[in-house]
UniProtKB/Swiss-Prot annotation:
UniProt-annotated location(s): Cytoplasm
SUPFAM superfamilies: 4'-phosphopantetheinyl transferase
Gene of this entry: acpS
Listed name of the protein: Holo-[acyl-carrier-protein] synthase
Stored InterPro entries: 4-PPantetheinyl_Trfase_dom, 4-PPantetheinyl_Trfase_dom_sf, ACPS, Ppantetheine-prot_Trfase_dom
Cofactors, names only: Mg(2+)
Signal sequence residues: none
EC supergroup of this enzyme: transferase
Record bears the keyword rRNA-binding: no
Primary localization: cytoplasm
Taxonomy of the source species: Bacteria, Bacillati, Chloroflexota, Chloroflexia, Chloroflexales
Family: Belongs to the P-Pant transferase superfamily. AcpS family.
Catalyzed reaction equations: apo-[ACP] + CoA = holo-[ACP] + adenosine 3',5'-bisphosphate + H(+)
């Protein structure tokens, strides 16, 4: 069985949240590893990288059939949700993005019999996209 999730986010939306809420937003949504991956060599924030990781978290949640806690009006009130840190985008030894699940997200993946996840990230200056495919078998 295959499960798929895709998400598209405007980079400006993430930039606005970072500018408005600062580290409070960044720490709430992104793990320390994700934060480090989204800093340019100069230490400047790469908003498109943050947006791509946001999209990956959303796409993964869609593939798992769950929502993310903290999305306010976008979340369905009675639907179980995973925390932002429970879906983490890390890099493998070759630099490719991979997903690391924990907590409720990992429990849901196990309940669906998911044995592998693949994530693809892409972005322009304005938009970030993520696609997640989950294999159960």
């Amino acid at each position: 069985m295959l499960y798929h999730g895709v998400d598209l986010v405007e980079v400006a939306r993430i930039r606005h949240a970072v500018v408005r809420y600062g580290q409070r937003f960044v720490q709430r949504v992104y793990t320390a590893t994700e934060q480090a991956d989204c800093l340019a060599g100069s230490g400047d924030v790469r908003y498109e990288a943050l947006a791509a990781r946001w999209a990956a978290k959303e796409a993964c949640a869609k593939a798992l059939g769950i929502g993310l806690r903290g999305l306010g009006a976008l979340a369905v009130a009675d639907r179980p949700r995973a925390g932002f840190h429970e879906i983490e985008v890390v890099r493998d030894n070759d630099g490719r993005p991979v997903l690391r699940l924990s907590g409720f997200a990992a429990e849901q993946a196990a309940a669906l019999g998911i044995c592998a996840l693949a994530v693809s990230l892409s972005h322009t200056d304005e938009l970030a996209l993520a696609s997640v495919v989950a294999w159960a078998g």
